[in-house]
């Protein structure tokens, strides 16, 4: 049995026509790190707040180790919660902030002191015990919030976009810090974010939310390599897509299909498990799966599509090429494509405005 189980859980607010969470069924296993990923308004934070006890479901059941908890007050759920805002008491020292949950639980002074020291050591802030919150950096303040969430040894820790206010360097440091704590303590963690790179780095599993429902759930690499639809493909990582019409392809290998674009070009890719049955299809391919050349003769056989180079952007360890697909008749429905090329692999003589050929293997593309 899962540690946490959402069973047909829904949440709607009075006066609003949009359902915040729509018939959610989700299990969180003991000891796992599950990320709820999605855009603003997708239902991920509302789901976490219902689990924490700050919101009550409109329908359905939430179980913690088999026991229904949807009517249980938040302070009786024994869950640690870390918020984006840190929510530290400005008039208390670091140690006093961490000790607060223990004072509420009426632990002895000696037990409180022992646990506070241990929690601060876990987050590597023991030397800062007597400092005030305003004397700490943003990353240090978030470590204090983590220590406070862990000090009473909860069975579950909930993290609501705790790193979104930090700069890139601090955010990456805290990602590794939280991963380390999860690995060392083995505590179950549920993490909310809209940052797909955060989800990829930190999670055992990712649940991708959209319009109050889970589109897909699984290990991050599985979702990246085999998205179930165009939303997941576009939200979890960069993605190029183009629309076309499906058609018979008697020579396509098993599991592949062919689409014909508005400009008459045919492309082949893997048939997605949730591929639509209608005539209109969407082909998706990742930027790192594309190769670029000045003419078709420089590329291996496979899917090839003409384009015009719009921009060349250097991004540290790689180049990002932006290309507009060739569309003489104006009927092609596609945004500009991007190509990720390692430094040193950009074809010589490549300039903005130049016609190029893009190539990708059928097994690297999905057709939905």
Region roles according to the model:
Residues 45-48, 144:
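ABC ATPase nucleotide-binding domain helices that frame the ATP-binding cleft
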Residues 74-80, 84-234:
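ABC ATPase nucleotide-binding domains
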């Amino acid at each position: 049995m899962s540690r946490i189980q959402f069973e047909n859980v829904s949440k709607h607010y009075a006066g609003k026509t949009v359902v915040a969470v729509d018939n959610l069924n989700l299990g969180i296993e003991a000891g796992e790190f599950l990320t709820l990923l999605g855009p603003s308004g997708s239902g991920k934070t509302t789901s976490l707040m219902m689990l924490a006890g700050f919101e009550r479901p409109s329908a359905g059941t939430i179980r913690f180790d088999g026991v229904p908890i949807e009517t249980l007050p938040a302070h009786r759920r024994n869950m640690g919660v870390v918020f984006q805002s840190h929510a530290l008491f400005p008039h208390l020292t670091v140690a006093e902030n961490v000790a607060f949950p223990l004072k509420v639980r009426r632990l002895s002074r000696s037990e409180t002191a022992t646990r506070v020291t241990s929690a601060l050591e876990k987050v590597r802030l023991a030397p800062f015990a007597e400092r005030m919150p305003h004397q700490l950096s943003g990353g240090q303040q978030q470590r204090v919030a983590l220590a406070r969430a862990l000090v009473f040894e909860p069975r579950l820790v909930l993290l609501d976009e705790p790193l979104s206010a930090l700069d890139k360097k601090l955010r990456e440091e805290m990602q590794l810090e939280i991963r380390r704590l999860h690995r060392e303590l083995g505590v179950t963690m549920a993490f909310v974010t809209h940052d797909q790179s955060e989800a990829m780095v930190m999670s055992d599993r990712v649940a991708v939310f959209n319009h109050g429902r889970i589109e897909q759930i699984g290990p991050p690499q599985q979702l990246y390599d085999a998205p179930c639809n165009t939303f997941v493909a576009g939200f979890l990582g960069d993605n190029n897509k183009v629309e076309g019409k499906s058609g018979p392809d008697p020579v396509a290998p098993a599991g592949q299909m062919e689409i014909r674009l508005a400009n008459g070009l045919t492309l082949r890719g893997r048939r997605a498990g949730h591929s639509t049955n209608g005539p209109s299809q969407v082909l998706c391919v990742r930027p790192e799966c594309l190769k670029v050349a000045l003419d078709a003769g420089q590329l291996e056989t496979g899917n090839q599509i003409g384009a015009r180079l719009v921009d060349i952007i250097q991004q540290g360890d790689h180049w990002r090429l932006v290309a507009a697909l060739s569309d003489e008749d104006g009927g092609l429905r596609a945004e500009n494509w991007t190509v990720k090329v390692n430094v040193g692999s950009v074809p010589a003589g490549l300039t903005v405005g130049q016609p190029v050929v893009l190539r990708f293997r059928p097994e690297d593309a999905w057709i939905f």
